[in-house]
Amino acid sequence: MSLLEEMLAKKDNLLYLIDNITSAFPMEDPDIYKIKMHLQSLTQEDIYEDKIIPLFTEDDEARCLLDLLFDYYQKTYVEFGSVSRLFHKVLINISAENLTGIFTDSKLLHTTMRSICVLDGDHKSDITNFIVALPGKAAPEAVLLNYIKELYNNDDPFWKNRIIVDKGYSKNYYITNIKNLVGDFEAELVRLHKNGESSKGKRRAFNKKLFNDNQNFFTFVFKHWLHNKVNKAEIDRFYNELHTLFLKVAPYHEINPKEWT
């Protein structure tokens, strides 16, 4: 096998014949993954049964949006459908600062180069260190709060969508459950500032609670955001960067990079 791997690495011409019992025929575009599969009489499903690419995120909110992003990509890009199952979103919350520290630590390079770090959109991608930032250029909750405010102020057709209407997500729902609470929170921040009290971390905590208390509603908001042409560049940027990292990480898990072409 090592000789085959060496030949493929050097891009030497290699003819591999598939034994089909009654006949033999050449394998098209032979690579080490296909050859191993046939030598061991395995199917593609067998080979990838226990193989995953770990995705580390900051929190549950990021994983929620990542699930919706993956669902969107599967419906939009046929080639993504076959690889989405290979990504494993690790159920652990790690701050952006700590994640960045781990993935940029040269001593841990051998470990981190086998995983992908997904930071919130208020950070920047660092492909060299296997870090990609979510689309939106802000934390997930902030992206959605800003977007729903925009839909409200512009009287967007979103509010007349039959699914939204049937779910009871009217403008009154937004005003009562989100807009008024945001207004009260902003007033509280002003009070803290006047009294010289710290407001550190309060906005993020407030946004997270608001998101989780209205998660079903914000799911529809994000789906609308995904289909808004204004956001296409950001959505495509994340897709392309994730693709680049997949190509870099896949071989470490014996996953054929050609699965996503």
Give the label of every model feature segment.
Residues 3, 61-65, 140:
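Short phosphate-engaging motifs
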Residues 167-261:
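C-terminal, charge/polar-rich interaction regions
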Residues 120-205:
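Activity-critical C-terminal alpha-helical subdomain
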Residues 54-58, 88, 92, 133, ...:
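Generic alpha-helical structural element
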Residues 9-125:
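RecA-like P-loop NTPase motor core
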Residues 78, 152, 156-160, 234, ...:
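Residue-level signal for secondary-structure boundary elements
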Residues 1-8:
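Sensor-1/coupling segment of RecA-like P-loop NTPase cores
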Residues 102, 143, 147, 241, ...:
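Residues that form generic nucleotide/phosphate-binding pockets
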